[in-house]
């Protein structure tokens, strides 16, 4: 009789512990969704400002817009890479591996992708993230003027600065890889110069005979 009671007690404790664990994970998922929402809001506002600058915004407002976008990019970077945000994503990632308490395929992918974004962003200082956004915003405004005036000389310095900064960021993200491969992987995950060359050869072998 005592053994049966022990088994029932253990089962009850295990069930209660499982319930507590599930509640803890549910709470973490809600925090994760809230974090995603905050990040998306900042990304959305940055895209709206970028689109505005490329279309109808007054040309003489580029400097102010660049400053505002830089500040917002900094806030986004701080939120993404904060210790609290990183630990939240890591805790959920651990649940997917160890406990299996997260089984929604879409949520699993979102956790994986946001974790990857955090790892890549964390190696870049917030000040550099802000400066990069300001630089590209200013460069876009200069490009519009230079294109109209056929004035490459005024835009060339921005190209040099952008390329230099891209190389620097690639070095921070993955010093062992060629910068070109790092950025190819950013725009198409898993892509490299080698795999892209192989793809182009396949296309060439198929298309050229048809021309």
Regions found by a protein language model. Give the residues of each.
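N-terminal helix-rich structural modules
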Residues: 2-159
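Contiguous, non-catalytic segments that form substrate-binding/exosite surfaces or channel walls
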Residues: 132-211
């Amino acid at each position: 009789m005592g053994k049966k009671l022990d088994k029932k007690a253990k089962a009850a404790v295990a069930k209660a512990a499982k319930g507590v664990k599930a509640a803890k994970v549910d709470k973490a998922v809600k925090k994760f969704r809230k974090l995603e929402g905050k990040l998306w809001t900042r990304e959305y506002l940055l895209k709206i400002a970028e689109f505005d600058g490329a279309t109808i915004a007054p040309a003489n407002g580029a400097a102010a817009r660049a400053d505002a976008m830089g500040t917002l990019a900094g806030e986004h970077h701080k939120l993404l890479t904060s210790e609290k945000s990183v630990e939240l994503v890591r805790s959920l990632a651990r649940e997917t591996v160890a406990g299996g308490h997260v089984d929604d395929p879409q949520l699993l992918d979102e956790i994986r992708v946001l974790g990857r974004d955090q790892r890549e962003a964390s190696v870049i200082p917030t000040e550099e993230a802000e400066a990069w956004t300001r630089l590209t915003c200013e460069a876009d405004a200069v490009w519009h003027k230079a294109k109209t005036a056929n004035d490459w000389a005024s835009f060339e310095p921005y190209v040099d600065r952008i390329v230099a900064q891209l190389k620097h960021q690639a070095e921070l993200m993955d010093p062992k890889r060629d910068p070109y491969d790092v950025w190819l992987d950013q725009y198409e995950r898993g892509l490299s110069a080698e795999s892209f060359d192989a793809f182009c050869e396949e296309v060439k072998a198929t298309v050229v005979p048809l021309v």
